[in-house]
Amino acid sequence: MYTQADEYDGGDAGYEDDYSGYQGDGDDSVGSYNVPEEIKRFIHFFHQHVLEQNLYEIQSIYENGFNKLTDRYFNKTPWPEAEFIAPLVSGDQVFLILYKELYYRHIYNKLKPTVEQRFESYYNYCDLFNYILNTDEPVPLTLPNQWLWDIIDEFIYQFQAFSQFRSKLQNKPEDEIDVLRANSKIWNIHSVLNVLYSLVEKSRINYQLEMYNTNGNPDEVSGEFGIHPLYKMLGYFSLIGLLRLHSLLGDYFQAIKVLSNVELTRNTMYSRIPACQITTYYYVGFAYLMMRRYQDAIRCFSSVLLYIQRTKNMLQTKSYQYEEIMKKNDQMYNLLAIALTLCPQQLDENVHSQLREKCTEKMQKLQKGDLQMFEECFSYSCPKFVSPVPPNFDAPPANYNREPFNLQLKVFMNEVAQQSMIPVIRSYLKLYTTMPIAKLAAFLDMDEATFRNQLLCYKHKQRNLVWTKGTDGLDGEQQSSSEVDFYIDRDMIHIADTKVDRRYGEFFMRQIYKFDEMARNLQAL
């Protein structure tokens, strides 16, 4: 049992005065499991504010109270099961669904879920989304944006985790394989996609974003449901969820397409959740990388890495997300190193200095064409790809979970291999303004026909589609990404250096402004 000194301290500062005597609406008799008094008080307090739709208190409980109690009492054990909580909240089914969402998420995060728990969590998400979607009028539920994002994020994560778990057939007991075979529709890709697209449609979020992008009033097209923050934000977060899900399936075109109304270069009310912002840019950048749109990938990674640098202190206050964000940060520096090797570009000075600090040795190996290093960087930084279908349970047991990854790795490495000679050719072209084809072919120990093919490859690979304006990330203009261009006149290569001289004046001006701001802040102390 816990003492009175262990008062719940995660919610409102006035919690003890206002609720310490609150006994709840239901019977506190909860069977054989003895729910600690502090947890009872927390559940009563939590339930009361969910009923009252008190957004400020719910956010405080969600971001602070629940995590503090988890660290204190349930770091290595699950929270009490919902059946033991039900009497404390008069069997309130909506609250119990929300509680179970946190309950199963904690198990996934801190413990190892059983097959039954994976199934039960799926059914709980079905109950939650059915409650929100299968209604003729908006439901009376208010949740903070952070929780709404985490619901969508966790929903996709658990689908991904189950898909990989189901594909690891080696060393699985036969009875467990039989259970998986008999329940092939649980965590089915179609049901996951259906939920996300239904939330997008219910919220009319694409219509709202179209109106927002033209400086109109989104409320005019939001409809009965989309005007409510619950539906609006779930709709927006579902777009990001679809970006992630299509990327996990290897459909990068569709991944970018679902964001056709999202203007990434514009700060909006939708981009105030750091984890959502970082997830968006990571998956958009990765999709661009796999589509050979390296300049767009570099732009995305640079933008979000600069954002992480500037908000690092704020992100540290949310410790439950900080580790994952820092891992994404490292992954994106690796992906940026790959993109810069394949398509050298100028970077923001702050991002460039961090890249040198983190990836100098890797960059050197990548620039030398070390295929092993390309594979290592890709393996560490790519998403955990999944198959859209269950494995063949009747085939000999094997770990099929690596098949989607191996396919994407093969596609990526084939592209890298095709470009392996480009850095070498570029280094020679930089040295001359004209050069006979035969002479440069001799330098590279190639026959003339093979070298002509390599020059054509250079031209083709260094000309990419680049986004320039608008909200549709698939749009763009064909641009040459190389700082060295050339044309061939008969047997002579004519070379032009298109590199733009670095404007050092802008760099020094930025530093002067920073020091000026720092001086003003010091004077104000």
Swiss-Prot record:
Lineage: Eukaryota, Metazoa, Cnidaria, Anthozoa, Hexacorallia
GO molecular function: translation initiation factor activity
Keywords linked to the UniProt accession: Cytoplasm, Initiation factor, Protein biosynthesis
Name of the protein in its database record: Eukaryotic translation initiation factor 3 subunit L
Classification via InterPro entries: eIF3l, PCI_dom, TPR-like_helical_dom_sf
One GO CC term, this protein: eukaryotic translation initiation factor 3 complex
Keyword presence, Protein biosynthesis: yes
Family listed: Belongs to the eIF-3 subunit L family.
Ranges for domain PCI: 296-502
Subunit-level organization: Component of the eukaryotic translation initiation factor 3 (eIF-3) complex.
UniProt cross-references to Pfam families, sorted A to Z: Paf67
Intracellular or extracellular location(s): Cytoplasm
Taxonomic source organism: Nematostella vectensis (Starlet sea anemone)
GO biological process per UniProt: formation of cytoplasmic translation initiation complex; translational initiation
HAMAP family assigned: eIF3l
Region Disordered, annotated ranges: 1-21
